[in-house]
Design a protein with these regions (language model features):
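UBC/E2-like fold recognition across ubiquitin and ubiquitin-like conjugation systems
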Residues: 1-92, 101-190
Length: 190
């Protein structure tokens, strides 16, 4: 597979996007004068569009780690803050989104990463999230932003910080990719 992401140092005069039939160049003067050159395929164009939207107008408490995205368009780190007035107020979390070339027809792989994995009845201690829109209920109409809002809402509605009852056995026996898990969605009351 070809490496579709290359970085070059140059001196741009301002932020701009230059497109041709096969390549997009995103040039940002504010970010170390780097150029991001990407081959244009449908899934990459969709990711670029979602990324620009999320950077320009992020939902409250959600921010893209732009350094992670500049390294690899197929893996995004998203920072999420606990909503004020909830059990997670003042806490900071990180989500890792992994995309494949079937996106948006195939859902991204989404997990919590880092030292602070939320203690929640639908979040396992390894960062896997039991949320139907990440697997069975995924639709190409959904986006990274809608996933972030769903996860933020899931955290905000939680009434008790506790792990799923099967956390211990699941973490020991699960696949590394949570999308390969056959989830049973039986509890929407947390």
């Amino acid at each position: 597979m070809f490496n579709r992401l290359r970085m070059r140092k140059e001196k741009p005069s301002k932020s701009e996007t230059i497109s041709t039939a096969t390549t997009t160049v995103i040039q940002d003067a504010a970010k170390d004068n780097k150029k991001l050159i990407l081959d244009n395929s449908r899934w990459e164009r969709r990711l670029q569009k979602e990324l620009m939207s999320l950077i320009k107008e992020p939902p409250p408490g959600v921010a893209v780690d732009e350094d992670s995205v500049s390294q690899n368009l197929t893996q995004w780190i998203i920072n999420i803050d606990g909503v004020e007035g909830t059990l997670y107020e003042g806490e900071h979390f990180q989500l890792l989104f992994k995309f494949n070339n079937k996106y948006p027809f195939d859902s991204p792989e989404v997990t919590f990463i880092g030292a602070n994995i939320p203690v929640h009845p639908h979040i396992y201690s390894n960062g896997h999230i039991c949320l139907s829109i990440l697997t069975d209920d995924w639709s190409p109409a959904l986006s990274v932003q809608s996933v972030c809002l769903s996860i933020s809402s899931m955290l905000s509605s939680c009434r008790e910080k506790r792990r799923p009852p099967d956390n211990g056995i699941y973490v020991k026996t699960c696949n590394k990719n949570p999308k390969k898990t056959k989830w049973w969605y039986h509890d929407d009351s947390v």
